[in-house]
Amino acid sequence: MTTIFRLASSSSPSLRHDATPHNFHIRKTSISNTFSFSSKNSLSFKRILTSGGSRRFIVAASPPTEDAVVATEPLTKQDLIDYLASGCKTKDKWRIGTEHEKFGFELGSLRPMKYEQISELLNGIAERFDWDKVMEGDNIIGLKQGKQSISLEPGGQFELSGAPLETLHQTCAEVNSHLYQVKAVAEEMGIGFLGIGFQPKWERKDIPMMPKGRYEIMKKYMPKVGSLGLDMMFRTCTVQVNLDFSSEADMIRKFRAGLALQPIATALFANSPFTDGKPNGFVSMRSHIWTDTDKDRTGMLPFVFDDSFGFEQYVDFALDVPMYFVYRKKKYIDCTGMTFRDFLAGKLPCIPGELPTLNDWENHLTTIFPEVRLKRYLEMRGADGGPWRRLCALPAFWVGILYDEVSLQRVLDMTADWTLEEREMLRNKVTVTGLKTPFRDGLLKHVAEEVLELAKDGLERRGFKESGFLNAVAEVVRTGVTPAERLLELYHGKWEQSVDHVFDELLY
């Protein structure tokens, strides 16, 4: 059989934010495929794979070099710019891609799931619900079905990366179907799942590490660049939405609106007030952790608000973000501290003389972690994980604002005179004070009221009857009380200062 692949997966906002290369090496099926990528430099790529076997297949996490995309001429900076620009699509092709993570735990002991249990769970879901297994060596590390994938974060956080869908009704149905499947298998194993932004009870030493090569490299590097990076890896969960743009100008508008409003999203979804079994002084510990993870690859990207900003400026930024690794001969090679700019010039000491492929570039882009991230779509990354209604509300909030021209323009007008210092202040303070954060002559709550109205109006103008998905956050805006503050009320009240009750309260 012959399959034509588009380069490195569809550019719709569907696939992983981790650095698993997308030109998957597929076994147990016979494949002969050829694909090409057109740019101003007319790069062409070719790959042939053949092997016999049955129709069901296993997808390996990353391609061996010999099966990887090989460029017929060296990549240029323009190719990297063109790669981002290739995400532009007409409005009728805009989609919604939602990702969420959750903590698995033993229902009896509340202890985190071990890898052996996760492996059993993944195999169970694959067999019962017809998913294809994603392997790294002999270890199962994820599942794929159509354009959906399930993957593992470093501490075993269980992630669904949804397919690119047209409406929020489809998105919420996808989340419900996933939670049903996971629950069906997990309950038989005595496993539950928790929707929260930060591991509330267990210390970092209690969290098992998943057998993925890239995480070994990150684990060694993180303590060199920040004090909280390991907590980010092992103890946080998020929900994010990935959205399309029509042009460079549209990308810039959405990027700026997304960054300006990200602290409001952080406050609305703040849901991580406990660490090591006690209140931690934050409403979003998860968001705070990103402020001391790695300054080179995180933050509010002030340059996005420069008049000169565009695809090229993001490429310049990404070229100078230190790399984590390259993947060659079925192994992750540690390239920490070196830059993609060095790689482009063939000057990586870890693989002397080698030049990057677009696959390497795609992987590198996924190791950058700002509050809004650009790939061939935009990722809104400011929200804590939470219960299923909020998993549907987060994409609803951003779709209502960014996919409606009127609401988007109103947000841009509203935030146009916000200074860099104000945006940074909001980003840092909402993690503690949520919607009660003072802003200008009022509270952030007052801005959030206006923004939620714009999101609702934007959804109504879309005409799909989607505004009901905002109900899960409407109460937060009305009262100014974040989900985290509700949990703290319970902790100091009927839970009698025992965090164990949160595993029941936020059980999926």
UniProtKB/Swiss-Prot annotation:
Subcellular location: Plastid, Chloroplast
Quaternary structure (record): Homodimer or monomer when oxidized or reduced, respectively.
Associated pathway: Sulfur metabolism; glutathione biosynthesis; glutathione from L-cysteine and L-glutamate: step 1/2
Gene Ontology terms for molecular function: ATP binding; glutamate-cysteine ligase activity
Catalytic activity: L-cysteine + L-glutamate + ATP = gamma-L-glutamyl-L-cysteine + ADP + phosphate + H(+)
Ranges that cross the membrane: none
Presence of keyword Transit peptide: yes
Organism for this UniProt entry: Medicago truncatula
Name used for this protein in its record: Glutamate--cysteine ligase, chloroplastic
EC number(s) reported in the record: 6.3.2.2
